[in-house]
Amino acid sequence: MEEPQSDPSVEPPLSQETFSDLWKLLPENNVLSPLPSQAMDDLMLSPDDIEQWFTEDPGPDEAPRMPEAAPPVAPAPAAPTPAAPAPAPSWPLSSSVPSQKTYQGSYGFRLGFLHSGTAKSVTCTYSPDLNKLFCQLAKTCPVQLWVDSAPPPGTRVRAMAIYKQSQYVTEVVRRCPHHERCSDSDGLAPPQHLIRVEGNLHAEYSDDRNTFRHSVVVPYEPPEVGSDCTTIHYNYMCNSSCMGGMNRRPILTIITLEDSSGKLLGRNSFEVRICACPGRDRRTEEENFRKKGESCPKLPTGSIKRALPTGSSSSPQPKKKPLDEEYFTLQIRGRERFEMLREINEALELKDAMAGKESAGSRAHSSHLKSKKGQSTSRHRKLMFKTEGPDSD
């Protein structure tokens, strides 16, 4: 059905008037009116005007039209919700644990360290008894590489840090958040790496995509003329006591010798402690290590520990019975010596009697000691008789 055409002579309803006609309906000086609320009220349509729209007769060819609905007002944007606090960063867990077992391989790979004492002024010192390196933060730590025969060309040396304790060995060793934000980068090392190589522009810092572990790799260089070993200078860029990092957990540094394809040629490791006073900490730990070794001495071969009686562990142990029941005859020259030794003997007998009373706590045992003391008195008389004879050798 075709829609009837509108007659141009018919005036359109109010809702379709032009903007100029609507502007004329506004009260004068509405913009500069001191009462803006009253001017806004004048703009509001009265109920009579609305009723007039509905009762107005439309033209012959035009149906009454309803006023167009006002466009929907977009809802006011909600106030931005406060951002939730970022969760604490969780350290990534490694899917594999590198081996720390010493493996010299066919080239006799091993490590060496410079000899240094335990003075407070040292910045790096190694303890052979503990196989542990004590060093300060970001200080030079020379590590010597020894081989019996030269490895093939393209050999590399990799250094990696892992936690020593089994409950933390799967965690990746990295710097604490505070030291990560420090501006001490040399342009090559990522800020989260703990181990760096000093004075080597060929160092490569690796982040394994599978294990997430950090390592630094340098090409192996043969010893210089007149030297028997190759020295690499490492730096440790975080303290062992830093919260959020190692957090006082002991770590190991694993040094591996690899060929150009990554095949293992040798492996060695040592423990590391990064602290403020390496000499003092080394001296303290070595003393504790020696004390622990002295408190648990090794038993000789074939020795058997004798089990203690389960009766009274707190009471003093009695002497061996064969020694208590044996009697000896002693020939003494001179009465003065005899009286002195007799008093000593009586004092010892009295001491044994008092010890027996404390352990047993019975009169029967004390009477036995008195009878034993009487026997010793008769023995003294016998000794006195012998002293009257000729002197003996």
Swiss-Prot record:
Report what the protein is called: Cellular tumor antigen p53
Cross-link for Glycyl lysine isopeptide (Lys-Gly) (interchain with G-Cter in SUMO), residue positions: K386
Record region (Interaction with USP7): 357-383
Required cofactor(s): Zn(2+)
Gene3D superfamilies in the record: 2.60.40.720, 6.10.50.20, p53-like tetramerisation domain
Ranges for region Interaction with HRMT1L2: 1-83
**What is the gene name?**
TP53
Q: Which residues carry the record's DNA-binding region feature?
A: 102-292
Task: List, as start-end ranges, the regions of compositional bias called Pro residues.
Answer: 69-90
UniProt site positions, description: Interaction with DNA: K120
Q: Where is this region: Interaction with CARM1?
A: 300-393
